[in-house]
């Protein structure tokens, strides 16, 4: 069941435009009829409402161990934009273990905004024996971006959004370091830390010659909302 929290004196709104300069350059503007202002408006609307916690994940998915969750792998052949002749591809993470919050993911293209629907058949569950309902009702926990960093024959993992507002990026001839966060709230306080999370993403479909990828994100939590723009 979902639960609600009373609003604080002010539910704060944060708005960020971030350029991840690991291997791409920042570009301004968009050819699509959706942009940062749209996300900021949604964040304002959320900030004006009482926070509502998402419904709980199925118990069997909550109970997955680290290794069991790792055994649920997205099938590479089901990657978004695979076979479309585009420089980027998207792969997705399954909910479970510590990654229990639902994340909505959309593609922004010339036709508008289209939700990328979760499909359990896009995943290999390995040795896990989940009920069909739990698997299909899971939804996404996050996603990763692939791009040919070193050779045109292979698309490397270059950016990951998974868990709360955590993300990490990888450039050519680099190794992953610590993850970054979109926002940290009440860190190291006796009252306990609050973990805002990215509830929804909008990813612009790239052109066949694109060298950048634009991602918008909406953040939400008990005391804050946020709008973000990432350009790789």
Spans of features found by a protein language model:
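Solvent-exposed N-terminal domain segments of exported/luminal and surface proteins
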Residues: 41-189
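Bacterial N-terminal signal peptides that target proteins for export
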Residues: 2-17
């Amino acid at each position: 069941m979902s639960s609600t929290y009373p609003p604080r004196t002010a539910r704060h709104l944060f708005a960020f435009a971030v350029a991840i300069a690991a291997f791409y350059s920042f570009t301004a503007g968009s050819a699509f009829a959706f942009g940062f202002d749209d996300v900021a408006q949604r964040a304002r609307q959320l900030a004006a409402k009482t926070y509502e916690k998402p419904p709980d994940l199925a118990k069997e998915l909550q109970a997955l161990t680290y290794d069991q969750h790792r055994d649920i792998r997205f099938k590479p052949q089901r990657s978004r934009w695979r076979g479309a002749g585009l420089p980027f591809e998207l792969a997705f993470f399954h909910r479970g273990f510590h990654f229990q919050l639902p994340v909505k993911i959309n593609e922004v293209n010339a036709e508008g905004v289209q939700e990328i629907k979760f499909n359990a058949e896009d995943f290999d569950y390995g040795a896990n024996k989940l009920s069909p309902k739990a698997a299909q009702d899971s939804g996404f926990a996050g996603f990763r971006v692939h791009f040919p960093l070193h050779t045109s024959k292979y698309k490397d993992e270059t950016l990951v959004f998974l868990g709360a507002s955590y993300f990490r990026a990888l450039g050519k001839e680099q190794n992953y370091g610590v993850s970054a966060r979109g926002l940290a709230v009440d860190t190291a306080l006796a009252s306990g830390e609050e973990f805002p999370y990215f509830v929804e993403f909008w990813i612009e479909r790239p052109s066949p010659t694109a060298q950048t990828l634009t991602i918008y994100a909406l953040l939400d939590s008990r005391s804050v909302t946020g709008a973000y723009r990432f350009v790789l």
